[in-house]
Structure formats: structure tokens, C-alpha cells
């Protein structure tokens, strides 16, 4: 099996940080449909490989279940659970952490009142959890885990420390607020395209890190496939000349046909047949050019004269793809 060296080559990846929560990543250049296929693939993998941190179960003293309200607290228990669920938290350099809140009222309990046995970061510390109106103690112990450990169970926490009245929070939320990709065509060659990713997160992970994690996992999977098929053993097709001389691209070939200063009728006829560059035009034979629909002899002669001014002729051979 043979593989062409430059079927498509990526030349540049650039990142523009709009804010701490949003970044735009540009990848170029692509040919044909590679751009759309790769964009959809990377978008799906980013969602799969981006993890978050979540409180999975907790114990609030003197509360028997989520339907039992604690006297002296303005909010009901279900509202408190919603507030805890909306806290954006990250465990640094670990996957599991114990969290605790212990505060005596009257007071306002916020996310910054949470303490842990691990190094944690809370991105919305002013998030209100509950309002304590009476002179009581609000005491809550929680277990926070990485979303990769969805089926995590702590038997010591559940069955030895607290044998009952444990409240479970099962829904994991993705830290990605929005993720879109779009394609932009180059002006001088419509066959070449740029791929853009617009990533916005809640702050618990940087948008660039979402993209890096995605590429890391893709590489790990495909490294195994390449080693299995013995990719390096296949013979590659050399696109260069047999004498190994470097091909010099004439810059005129990459210019738009608008530079030929043709009439509007001639330009429209060429563009309707997907001829946008001078290099595309000179590869056509005289018979094929004159047979273009709606292109008369006057336009035909006009094109020949314009090409002669550039020292070019029809039916020219180009050893490389534009």
C-alpha cells in the first residue's frame, strides 16, 4: 500500500484568547472535505475528554432527606442542594476530596466557607448556599470527585461514618458552556480552508486545555493503531521530480484571474467553471477553453492576449497541485 506524502498538510495552529473563559483556535490549511470531517470529530472528542468536578453525595446534620427542611434556615433543602450543585470547584492534582461546611448563625453561608482536606479552587466563591436566620450550626460534609470517576463509591463514608440520611447528587455538568467550529475559505484559492474552534468554559478548565486534552487522547489512540498496522513500513510516493530538484512555484500561478484585467463576461464564464487562479487557467487546452458555455470568440481571444502579456500560454504543464 502506498501513501501520498502531501495529501494534506497542516501549516499553522494559532490561539486567540478572547477572555479567561473563551478562546478561538485556528488550524490551517486543509483541502477539500478534510476540514469538515476533522472539525466534527474533534468537537465530539473535546466533549468526551473534558472532565469536571462534582459533589456526588453529602450529609447535612439534622436533615433526614432532601424532602426534610432544617428549622432556622430560610431555604428549603432542595434549594440548598441546587446551590451546592452550581458551585464550580476544582481539585488540584487529585481526583477525590472531602469537603466540609460548619458555620454558626445567624449568617449567610457562601461557597468560600467550604474547607477541604485537599488543595481545591472554587471559581464562584460568592455563590450563596443558604441563609441561617437562627442561632443554630449548619454542618455539612460532602464528597467531591472527578467526573471520570462517575461510579465512585466510598464505603467508609457511606456505611461506617454515616449509615443513613446520605443525599446523592448524580448529575455531572460539563464545564464547557459552548463549543462550535466553523470553516473559512481562503480568498486566493477556494479549495484551501481554515478550521476555527470557538470554545467557552465555566472557568474550571481553560478552553485551550480542553483542546490539548482532546489532541492528547486522539494521539494515544492512533499511536496504537499505527503500531498495529506498521505504518512506517509502507512505501511512500515522492511527489518531487526524479532528479530531486526542488520545485519552484511561480507566484503568478497563485494570482487570481482578476489580475488578467478581463471583461466581466469573461471572468464570469471562467468562475462559473471553477477557474479562479491563473494557474488553473493555463492548464486548460484551447479546445476546452473555447467549449466553455457562453464564452464567445471575442472573450476567447481576450483571454489569450491577456495571458501573453504575462508570458503564459494555455495547455501548460504544472508539476504540483495549487
UniProtKB/Swiss-Prot annotation:
EC identifiers of the protein: 2.7.7.6
Gene assigned in the entry: rpoA
GO cellular component term of the entry, any: cytoplasm
Function: DNA-dependent RNA polymerase catalyzes the transcription of DNA into RNA using the four ribonucleoside triphosphates as substrates.
Catalytic activity: RNA(n) + a ribonucleoside 5'-triphosphate = RNA(n+1) + diphosphate
A GO biological process held by the record: DNA-templated transcription
Gene Ontology molecular functions: DNA binding; DNA-directed RNA polymerase activity; protein dimerization activity
Ribosomal protein recorded as keyword: no
Superkingdom, taxonomy of origin: Bacteria
Keyword Chloroplast attached: no
Record's keyword terms, sorted: DNA-directed RNA polymerase, Nucleotidyltransferase, Transcription, Transferase
Family: Belongs to the RNA polymerase alpha chain family.
Protein name as it appears in the record: DNA-directed RNA polymerase subunit alpha
Record's subunit section: Homodimer. The RNAP catalytic core consists of 2 alpha, 1 beta, 1 beta' and 1 omega subunit. When a sigma factor is associated with the core the holoenzyme is formed, which can initiate transcription.
Region annotated Alpha N-terminal domain (alpha-NTD), chain positions: 1-229
Domain notes: The N-terminal domain is essential for RNAP assembly and basal transcription, whereas the C-terminal domain is involved in interaction with transcriptional regulators and with upstream promoter elements.
Region described as Alpha C-terminal domain (alpha-CTD): 244-322
Matches recorded under InterPro entries: DNA-dir_RNA_pol_insert, DNA-dir_RNA_pol_RpoA/D/Rpb3, RBP11-like, RNAP_asu_C, RNApol_insert_sf
Cystine residue pairs: none
One Pfam family recorded for the sequence: RNA_pol_A_bac
